[in-house]
């Protein structure tokens, strides 16, 4: 699907116009020196498979036919080729335009279009056709909606339960800024099997890395959702490393997650989507990722996936099997 093009005279805030790269992040209050750092050479242990082959083409065609999006494509995930080849994907609902401008993320920013009322049905039919045992549903931030999109998440969960009652469901949500209480109320009435919300980074980086987000608010969302659920729910969060944080700061975030009763953790290497995004300050070694996994297990996480290519939904089906 071709990206909308901004033409001369077109309103910059027109609905449906996608801003990426420099146009997306130019208003983010970040130190210019941070963006202009020379790009580091990727080490030998960071290798992604090319997104080619018949299964990859089949998955993309199916997405287009059902008017669905995957975070794999929209966020330029390096694992797209591997996941699509095995018939798995993380479905991104509520469109492909985000109301936030996080400078680490490659999802487009702009004024989103209205929600597609047929999306829950199309999503449920697609995951049924794929024969998935476990599905991951995420979304763009929708700060334009009264409930932040919580009711649309719930509609997708209900429709998948109706069509595929044995399928386990994992949702990766935004922080529902200013609407978290309402979102928790809506989603606790239609719970998934795994509730995931990523902290992404350490608290001192939030103003630059997650503009519009709040570290404590994200922790409270994870805690409050678990408390509100009428059934046992697994909670999960994810971190990316390599933006200049110290190991001790990562360990403190992990402790904060455990103190808010989070069960599962993913830790992966941040990779710069383009020259316009935040640069990688450091590449972590496999040994450092192993260390973080070991420390996480000591803290009491039920499952820790830690590695350079690990992402929130990477092998999420296998991870879920260990705790559900």
Swiss-Prot record:
Catalyzed reactions: [[Fe-S] cluster scaffold protein carrying a second [4Fe-4S](2+) cluster] + N(6)-octanoyl-L-lysyl-[protein] + 2 oxidized [2Fe-2S]-[ferredoxin] + 2 S-adenosyl-L-methionine + 4 H(+) = [[Fe-S] cluster scaffold protein] + N(6)-[(R)-dihydrolipoyl]-L-lysyl-[protein] + 4 Fe(3+) + 2 hydrogen sulfide + 2 5'-deoxyadenosine + 2 L-methionine + 2 reduced [2Fe-2S]-[ferredoxin]
Presence of the UniProt keyword GTP-binding in the record: no
Location(s) in or outside the cell: Cytoplasm
EC number: 2.8.1.8
InterPro entries for this protein: Aldolase_TIM (IPR013785), Elp3/MiaA/NifB-like_rSAM (IPR006638), LIAS_N (IPR031691), Lipoyl_synth (IPR003698), rSAM (IPR007197)
Disulfide bridges in this chain: none
Cofactor: binding comment: Binds 2 [4Fe-4S] clusters per subunit. One cluster is coordinated with 3 cysteines and an exchangeable S-adenosyl-L-methionine.
GO cellular component: cytoplasm
GO molecular function, a single term: 4 iron, 4 sulfur cluster binding
Ranges of residues in domain Radical SAM core: 84-302
Predominant place of localization: cytoplasm
Cofactor: [4Fe-4S] cluster
Residues noted as binding [4Fe-4S] cluster 2 in the record, renumbered to the chain: 98, 102, 105
Alphabetical list of Gene3D superfamilies matching this protein: Aldolase class I
Pathway(s) the chain acts in: Protein modification; protein lipoylation via endogenous pathway; protein N(6)-(lipoyl)lysine from octanoyl-[acyl-carrier-protein]: step 2/2
Keywords recorded for this protein, A-Z: 4Fe-4S, Cytoplasm, Iron, Iron-sulfur, Metal-binding, S-adenosyl-L-methionine, Transferase
Binding site for [4Fe-4S] cluster 1: 72, 77, 83, 313
NCBIfam families found in the cross-reference section: lipA, PRK05481.1, PRK12928.1
Family: Belongs to the radical SAM superfamily. Lipoyl synthase family.
Name of protein: Lipoyl synthase
Phylogenetic lineage: Bacteria, Pseudomonadati, Pseudomonadota, Gammaproteobacteria, Cardiobacteriales
Gene (UniProt): lipA
């Amino acid at each position: 699907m071709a990206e909308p093009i901004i033409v001369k005279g077109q309103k910059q805030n027109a609905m449906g116009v996608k801003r990426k790269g420099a146009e997306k992040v130019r208003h983010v209050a970040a130190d210019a020196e941070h963006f202009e750092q020379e790009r580091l050479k990727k080490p030998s242990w960071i290798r992604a498979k090319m997104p080619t082959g018949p299964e990859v083409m089949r998955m993309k065609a199916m997405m287009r036919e059902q008017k669905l999006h995957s975070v794999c494509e929209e966020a330029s995930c390096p694992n797209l080729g591997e996941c699509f080849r095995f018939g798995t994907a993380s479905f991104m609902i509520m469109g492909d335009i985000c109301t936030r401008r996080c400078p680490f993320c490659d999802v487009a920013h702009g004024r989103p279009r209205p929600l597609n009322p047929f999306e829950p049905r199309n999503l449920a039919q697609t995951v049924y056709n794929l024969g998935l045992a476990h599905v991951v549903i995420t979304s763009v931030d929708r700060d334009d909606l009264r409930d932040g999109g919580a009711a649309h998440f719930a509609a997708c969960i209900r429709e998948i339960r109706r069509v595929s009652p044995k399928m386990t469901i994992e949702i990766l949500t935004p922080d529902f800024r200013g609407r978290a209480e309402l979102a928790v109320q809506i989603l606790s009435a239609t719970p998934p099997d795994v509730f995931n919300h990523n902290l992404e980074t350490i608290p001192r980086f939030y103003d630059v890395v997650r503009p519009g987000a709040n570290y404590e608010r994200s922790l409270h969302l994870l805690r409050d959702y678990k408390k509100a659920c009428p059934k046992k729910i697994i909670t999960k969060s994810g971190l990316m490393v390599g933006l200049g944080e110290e190991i001790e700061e990562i360990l403190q975030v992990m402790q904060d997650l455990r103190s808010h009763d989070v069960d599962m953790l993913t830790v992966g290497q941040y990779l710069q989507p383009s020259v316009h995004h935040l640069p990688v300050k450091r590449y972590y070694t496999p040994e450092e990722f192993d260390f973080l996994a070991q420390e996480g297990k000591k803290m009491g996480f039920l499952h820790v996936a830690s590695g350079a290519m690990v992402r929130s939904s990477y092998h999420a089906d296998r991870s879920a099997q260990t705790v559900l």
